[in-house]
C-alpha cells in the first residue's frame, strides 16, 4: 500500500512541480519563522542570573507632570528611566546593600600602540556597585571601589575585546589608556562576558547590542 501511495505522489510531483516547489518553500519558511520565534522567546524568557534575580530591582518613579497644558495626563504609564535628580537622590540615600546609576557614553580611544588607529568606543558609566550586583567575570585585576568613586579616580575596567585590541590580550592592569581628553589607569580586565539580552539595561534599547567596550566611574 505504501508503495502505491509513493507512486501516486511521484506522479503528482512530476505533473505539478511548480506548485509542489511553492508548497515545500512555504512549509520551509513557516518552520524557519517558528524556530526564530521560539529562539527569541527562549532567550527573552530565560533567567540570566537565577541565583539572585529575586534581589535585583529596577527602580521606576513617576516624574511626569500631573497635567499637560492644564489637562490631566492621558497616558498613565510611568517613564522607563529615572531623571538625573531622582537617581542622584536615591543613590545618596544609600538604602540598598548595592545600588548603581548607569548610562552609555561614546569616547574617542587613542591607543599607545601606534599600529592601532584611534577609534570611537562605547563605555558604560556606572558605580563600583555595578560589579558585585551583576557579577561580570574578571580575567585580570578587579573592579574599582566605592572610595575610588568618591575620589573620582580616573580608573577603568576593560572588556576582553578592548584589552585584546589595545594590549594584545596581556595583563594590562596598571597600564594607561587615553579616552577622550583624559588618561585612565586600567584596574581590571573582564573575561568574555556578553549577556543577551543585556538584563542590566533593557529599557534604553540596547538589550541585544554588543557589550560595552570599557567601564568608567560615573562620578568622573
Can you name each region flagged by the protein language model?
Residues 1, 8, 23, 32, ...:
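Amphipathic alpha-helical recognition patches that constitute DNA-binding helices
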Residues 2-14, 86, 90:
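A short amphipathic helical element positioned immediately N-terminal to and/or at the very start
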Residues 16-48:
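Short, strongly hydrophobic transmembrane alpha-helices
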Residues 18, 95-96, 171:
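Glycine-centered tight turns that cap/initiate beta-strands
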Residues 24-28, 56, 176:
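Residues at or immediately flanking beta-strands
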Residues 38-165:
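Structured, solvent-exposed hinge/loop segments at the ends of secondary-structure elements
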Residues 128-144, 154-220:
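Mid-to-C-terminal secondary-structure elements
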Amino acid at each position: 500500500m505504501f508503495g502505491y501511495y509513493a507512486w501516486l505522489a511521484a506522479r503528482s510531483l512530476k505533473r505539478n512541480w511548480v506548485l509542489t516547489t511553492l508548497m515545500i518553500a512555504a512549509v520551509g519558511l513557516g518552520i524557519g519563522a517558528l524556530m526564530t520565534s521560539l529562539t527569541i522567546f527562549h532567550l527573552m524568557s530565560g533567567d540570566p542570573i537565577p541565583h539572585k534575580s529575586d534581589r535585583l530591582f529596577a527602580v521606576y518613579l513617576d516624574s511626569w507632570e500631573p497635567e499637560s497644558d492644564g489637562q490631566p495626563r492621558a497616558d498613565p504609564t510611568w517613564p522607563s528611566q529615572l531623571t538625573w535628580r531622582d537617581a542622584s537622590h536615591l543613590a545618596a540615600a544609600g538604602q540598598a546593600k548595592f545600588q548603581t546609576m548607569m548610562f552609555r557614553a561614546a569616547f574617542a580611544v587613542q591607543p599607545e600602540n601606534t599600529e592601532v588607529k584611534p577609534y570611537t568606543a562605547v563605555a558604560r558609566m556606572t558605580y563600583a556597585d555595578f560589579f558585585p550586583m551583576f557579577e561580570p567575570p574578571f580575567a585580570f585585576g578587579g573592579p574599582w571601589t566605592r572610595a575610588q568613586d568618591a575620589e573620582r579616580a580616573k580608573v577603568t575596567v576593560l572588556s576582553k575585546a578592548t584589552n585584546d585590541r589595545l594590549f594584545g590580550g596581556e595583563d594590562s592592569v596598571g597600564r594607561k589608556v587615553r579616552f577622550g581628553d583624559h588618561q585612565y589607569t586600567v584596574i581590571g580586565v573582564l573575561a568574555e562576558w556578553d549577556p543577551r539580552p543585556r538584563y542590566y539595561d533593557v529599557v534604553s534599547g540596547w538589550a541585544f547590542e554588543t557589550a560595552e567596550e570599557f567601564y568608567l566611574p560615573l562620578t568622573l
